[in-house]
Amino acid sequence: MAAYPKSPMGSGPVLEESHIYHAEATIFSGHLEHPIKQTIEPYGRVVLENTRRETLITQSVGETDIEGLISFKRGHTRVVGTQVKHKTDIFGNDHAGWVTLSTAVLEGFNVVDIITADRVVAQVSTEHPMVEGHVPTVTFLGSRFENFRIGGVPVEVELDLGICGSKPKGDRPYIEDADFLDRVERQLEHAADTKGLPETLEKQYDAKIAYIDDLKRRANGDPKLARNGYSKLQCSLIKSIGPIPIPGVRTFGNLIFIPNFGTVALAELEVGIGPSHGNGFSHEQDDPSGKPSDSNYFTLNMFDLKLGCPVGGGGSGPGVSGNGGTRP
């Protein structure tokens, strides 16, 4: 077995920094329950999986019709992993590091002639810096809805692309960052205050707010709330949804209820920490201390459909996910 190189002071091994890229993108996937039962396999799925190599993978899908119920004219996906060794912006900020980009685009989308959109883009990019590079800077710039309509009525959607904020200080995970947790809590409280909120949603929002309070106490060092496994937090890029003048249509946060159709949740985001992808390397090889290596991940789905009557089933997309791990 190869030995680690020794530092000049002889204090221990000097480990060369490296990065494992991981990203995924999918145009659309789901299932139908009635009037027929059918699995909708992921269209255009591409995966940049557990590799240290700089990589670009793309895929395009042409016109697609799923039993005359769900259709789209075209779509494409893209995942990129690359290292930028020397880069500063016009303000002199250093952006050297490892960058991962994941993109999914859906065009000419139609769900039983009720949900339509000319173009929907899901995009996430993470930048792991060379110094304190275990937690990345993240951006969702490029994500958007173009000419999104319900029953032919335009739906005005305002996105909060900065929901995650700046990279947390001290290389802390996002779900242990007080500023991020405060923003998500305010988002949930605003949705929970909606007039006429159904009891089922009220309970869900209350549970999510209580969970955030637990995350805050754990981040502040409460020994009773030490990490048990890996954690995650759901929120949304939606800042606001404009009025939809259709009888019976209601909005609750990022969720839209449509009578005789079901619900559609917009720009659903999951932020979490999980085991760093090791590409076959053990923790002992990468970190002599044996300390587990965590990886921050970000998963975004622009549409999450729950169909009721007369069509039953569900589906999501376009969707992207990005993470990766820097070692040691």
Role assignments for model-derived ranges:
Residues 2-328:
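Extended, solvent-exposed, non-transmembrane regions
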